[in-house]
From Swiss-Prot:
It catalyses: tRNA(n+1) + phosphate = tRNA(n) + a ribonucleoside 5'-diphosphate. Its EC number is 2.7.7.56. This is Ribonuclease PH. The keyword RNA-binding applies. HAMAP family: RNase_PH (MF_00564). Phosphorolytic 3'-5' exoribonuclease that plays an important role in tRNA 3'-end maturation. Removes nucleotide residues following the 3'-CCA terminus of tRNAs; can also add nucleotides to the ends of RNA molecules by using nucleoside diphosphates as substrates, but this may not be physiologically important. Probably plays a role in initiation of 16S rRNA degradation (leading to ribosome degradation) during starvation. Gene3D superfamilies: GHMP Kinase, N-terminal domain.
Amino acid sequence: MRFDGREKNALREIEVTPDYLMHPEGSVLIASGNTKVICSASVETKVPPFMRGEGRGWISAEYSMLPRATNTRNIRESSKGKVTGRTMEIQRLIGRALRAVVDLDALGERTIWLDCDVIQADGGTRTASITGAFIAMVMAIAKLDEEVPFTKFPVKDFLAATSVGVLEEGGTVLDLNYVEDSAAQVDMNIIMTGSGAFVELQGTGEEATFSETELAELIALGKKGISELIEIQKETLGDKITARIKGE
């Protein structure tokens, strides 16, 4: 039993509020325990310069955190005049993950921007951002589909992410909060599709190593958590959109 009462294979309580913002084509507030992220999807009828004239679309992401999303205030990156390496890494991760499940040819020559804004952080902000951004992105694409139906729905599969880790006294665990993440001997982020394919594995030992057996346990925990997250995504999006993703 962990200090917050969860079993080792339990996600934190997940709540998804769709249409959280009035202006974007798609938006959600996703809460993973005390971590809360607003994810919005905006559609632009243009693509980056390197893709012009190809007839293909693009998915890109931006990530930020409110100054007091954390225990102590952080200076806004706009005040610093530059984006930190961590932020750049997370933005690229979100965009790369989402592009893995989108047929960019079917999307057509348009860009979908995903903005992930952390309003409260308690560990797992990047994985919550990916899980929430997927929902917002699909909502935006579904609106395009209602206006002019796609011959082939661009979203090929569901996608979600979670964290797993190894604690000194708790062994392998699913969905680490900040306290656990700070003390973890091993921390890993897992991104998977609804069909069970891996998009990304990011695992690191912190002054520690991990065995092949522990790696297998971590992956099994991640698969369980992602399966549960994808069910929540399906419930949020509804049967009609879920059927479009399945090609029905």
